[in-house]
Amino acid sequence: MLSKDKLDRINVLSKKSKEEGLTTEEKAEQKKLREEYLKNVRSSFKNQLSTVTVLDPEGKDVTPQKLRDYQDRNKKH
């Protein structure tokens, strides 16, 4: 998870970008922070997917094979 300080900095840079523009250094910092944020979001999403089971109205497991394969590859022992 990204620290509150980093999230706050992302928001400050975004606001400044809209209001007055960013310096070259600030643009580089913003890009780095955004990449770190997206990496974190993707990782969290993948962790959530690894625990999902899809059930039909009758209670049968209908989890797509592609998701089952992903879960099998990423099981924690």
Curated annotation (Swiss-Prot):
Intracellular or extracellular location(s): Cytoplasm
Compositionally skewed regions (Basic and acidic residues) per UniProt: 57-77
Location of region: Disordered: 56-77
One Pfam family from the record: DUF896
Superkingdom of origin organism: Bacteria
One Gene Ontology cellular component annotation held by this UniProt entry: cytoplasm
Alphabetical keyword list: Cytoplasm
The keyword Cytoplasm is annotated on this UniProt entry: yes
PANTHER family, alphabetized: UPF0291 PROTEIN CBO2609/CLC_2481 (PTHR37300), UPF0291 PROTEIN YNZC (PTHR37300:SF1)
Family: Belongs to the UPF0291 family.
Name of this chain's protein: UPF0291 protein OB1671
Protein's organism: Oceanobacillus iheyensis (strain DSM 14371 / CIP 107618 / JCM 11309 / KCTC 3954 / HTE831)
Organism placement in taxonomy: Bacteria, Bacillati, Bacillota, Bacilli, Bacillales
